[in-house]
């Protein structure tokens, strides 16, 4: 369907042999790009995959677009959202600029959108009127490098992107920008601006089709894409799609009651006596957690998860808090504040479990439960965090080598005796590590069913670059620069960073996780909760920075879950993606206001824009998780974003 770009004076709007009027469309997006090198394809796909949406990709440089592309034989529309990588579908070939769609194909697409009431979103557009008029007049063009320009939402844009703060300043970097203005008398409203220039538009065509477009390039690695592309998908689909996007911040602290190695600013590591949490640190951590909730009301439900090793619990301790207490007061103060935190089984003695026997593995899990229960720490039996994620196939073949990077042998390299003991103790979920490829699920927020024991799933955590054995800003800064500074083991930065720069950068990495919708927890260690002065800790410095960045952009809550809830959600997502693979088929009927869902396989699926039993609301988004029987229709009420 490729045709050389020749801009006519007026858009082609000839009547096309297109689909007839129909009220039914599948909840599925069509991404239209020129070819596999089209940057917009990966950008759209990243967001759709994060959400768990159903979609197809059409490469129009080589694949014709026909009525059959868009409409099923029974007259149901195949797609409820059209997602263009760029509004002209232009690409370069042998020195010429071509459009992947010829005039007849454009007209087929427009007729489909018109007849089925389907919206179109373009990830990138310019000024001009070809192939159709987006009501944009040129104010110039510019490239943006690493120094950001700030994007603002108009009142219209704040409605489209209502999960963002209306006052948000969105940093645009590494982009090519068409600066435009709205053509007078044309049916369009600005959604995004930079100064007096329009960089985003919502417009209605002369034949009544609704369109949304940005005038700057994006890719899936940039913050502005994280913030805006979901809103474009949601707008184009009228909020009705498979999957959902919500934002979470979950944090684990490992090794409670245990002793940690201690890294000093001069680079030496103290192993004995090392570092231990005190009663004071515990009281302070509770105070800092309370202060974080007060300072960040969108995270008002935030609560820390603490993974504990019970071998050093003092069984004779009282239960009084000791605000000035030392190591000896840790157990009593923990008992005093036990309900202020959530608790996770991390084994009794913190052994590596790569080669432990069934008996040892069983005792480590079971005895730690007993030790915790004895002082009132309730940890879910279904969840186990093994020491250093051991026992799950990632280990150094030389057990005496503690410094070389471990080797990922895959989950089939797991310790079978650990798995057998865990199963017998009703463990359903084992923490994994996102740094280990074999622990990473195929889909975001899913779990990974263990290939050696299908009753157990692996749910990975995010590691952080706040090192496990640092307790102060000076220690963290020295260690970080010894790794990533210009003279470090893995040089990345041209100069050494300050502590403030490290926290800012690492909080930005975490914001990327949060913006993606990832529910997975971030892991820290006991050294990171030391009160290093004025009540401050490395952990809460990081959390405060992440929450501050989040609240600068988002209006919706920052969610926090206990581990049973988090783990169960990953199983729901695993089932959801299994339904996508099986061919689940939700169809929206605008005449009845219902969505009817069928699947060839039994299972569970998430649907946004649907009000059914157990529906939940997040901002203005409504999601229902549906249980499906094979080949049995289920109908729910649609809640479209109009």
Name these PLM-found stretches.
Residues 620-642:
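C-terminal beta-strand-rich structural cap/linker in extracellular carbohydrate-active enzymes
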Residues 25-28, 107-108, 113-116, 123-134, ...:
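Metal-dependent polysaccharide deacetylase catalytic core of the NodB/CE4 family, i.e.
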Residues 8, 12-16, 118-195:
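An acidic, glycine-rich "communication" segment
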Residues 583-617:
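Carbohydrate-binding surface patches
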Residues 46-50, 78-79, 116-119, 157-159, ...:
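A glycine-centered loop/beta-turn motif at secondary-structure junctions
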Residues 216-310, 339-349:
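An acidic-aromatic substrate-binding cleft motif
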Residues 217-219, 233-262, 373-375, 463-560:
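Catalytic grooves of carbohydrate-active enzymes
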Residues 30-122, 128-130:
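Helical hinge/lid and interdomain linker segments adjacent to catalytic or ligand-binding clefts
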């Amino acid at each position: 369907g490729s045709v050389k770009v020749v801009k006519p004076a007026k858009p082609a709007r000839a009547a096309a042999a297109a689909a007839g009027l129909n009220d039914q469309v599948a909840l599925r997006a069509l991404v239209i790009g020129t070819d596999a090198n089209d940057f917009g394809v990966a950008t759209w796909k990243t967001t759709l995959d994060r959400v768990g949406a159903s979609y197809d990709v059409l490469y129009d440089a080589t694949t014709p677009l026909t009525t059959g592309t868009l409409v099923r034989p029974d007259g149901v529309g195949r797609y409820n959202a059209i997602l263009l990588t760029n509004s002209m579908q232009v690409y370069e070939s042998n020195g010429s600029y071509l459009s992947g769609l010829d005039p007849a194909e454009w007209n087929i697409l427009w007729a489909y959108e018109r007849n089925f009431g389907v919206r179109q979103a373009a990830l990138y557009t310019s000024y001009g009127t070809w192939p159709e008029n987006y009501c944009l007049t040129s104010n110039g063009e510019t490239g943006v490098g690493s120094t950001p320009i700030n994007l603002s939402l108009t009142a219209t844009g704040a409605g489209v992107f209502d999960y963002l703060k209306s006052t948000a300043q969105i940093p645009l970097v590494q982009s090519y920008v068409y600066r435009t203005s709205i053509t007078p008398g044309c049916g369009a409203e600005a959604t995004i601006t930079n100064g007096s220039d329009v960089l985003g538009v919502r417009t209605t065509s002369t034949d009544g089709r609704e369109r949304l477009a940005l005038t700057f390039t994006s890719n899936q690695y940039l913050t502005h894409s994280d913030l805006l592309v979901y809103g474009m998908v949601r707008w184009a689909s009228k909020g009705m799609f498979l999957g959902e996007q919500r934002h979470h911040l979950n944090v684990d602290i490992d090794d409670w009651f245990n002793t940690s190695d201690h890294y000093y600013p001069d680079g030496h590591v103290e192993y004995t006596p090392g570092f231990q949490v005190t009663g004071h640190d515990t009281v302070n951590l509770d105070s800092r957690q309370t202060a974080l909730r007060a300072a960040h009301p969108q995270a008002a439900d935030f609560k820390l998860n603490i993974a504990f090793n019970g071998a050093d619990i003092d069984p004779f301790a009282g239960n009084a808090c000791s605000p000035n207490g030392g190591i000896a007061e840790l157990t009593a103060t923990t008992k005093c504040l036990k309900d202020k935190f959530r608790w996770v089984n991390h084994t009794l003695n913190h052994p590596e479990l790569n080669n432990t026997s069934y008996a040892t593995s069983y005792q480590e899990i079971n005895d730690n439960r007993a030790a915790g229960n004895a002082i009132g720490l309730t940890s879910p039996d279904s969840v186990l965090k093994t020491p250093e994620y051991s026992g799950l196939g990632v280990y150094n073949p030389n057990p005496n080598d503690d410094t070389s990077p471990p080797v990922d042998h895959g989950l089939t390299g797991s310790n079978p005796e650990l798995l057998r003991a865990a199963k017998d103790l009703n463990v359903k979920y084992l923490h994994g590590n996102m740094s280990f490829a074999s622990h990473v699920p195929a889909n975001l927020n899913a779990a990974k069913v263990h290939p050696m024991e299908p009753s157990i799933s692996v749910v990975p955590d995010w590691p952080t670059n706040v090192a496990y054995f640092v307790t102060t800003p000076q220690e963290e800064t020295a260690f970080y620069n010894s790794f990533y500074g210009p003279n470090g083991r893995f040089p990345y930065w041209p100069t050494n960073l300050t502590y403030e720069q490290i926290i800012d950068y690492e909080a930005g990495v975490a914001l990327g996780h949060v913006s993606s919708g990832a529910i997975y927890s971030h892991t820290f260690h006991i050294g990171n909760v030391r009160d290093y002065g004025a009540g401050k800790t490395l952990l809460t410095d990081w959390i405060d920075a992440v929450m501050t960045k989040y609240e600068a952009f988002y209006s919706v809550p920052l969610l926090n879950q206990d581990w049973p809830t988090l783990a169960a959600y990953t199983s729901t997502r695993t089932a959801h993606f299994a339904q996508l693979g099986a061919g689940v088929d939700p169809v929206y009927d605008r005449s009845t206001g219902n969505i009817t869902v069928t699947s060839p396989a039994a299972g569970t699926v998430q649907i946004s824009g649907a009000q059914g039993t157990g529906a939940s609301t997040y901002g203005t988004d409504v999601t229902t998780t549906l249980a499906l029987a094979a080949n049995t229709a289920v109908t729910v009420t649609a809640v479209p974003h109009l």
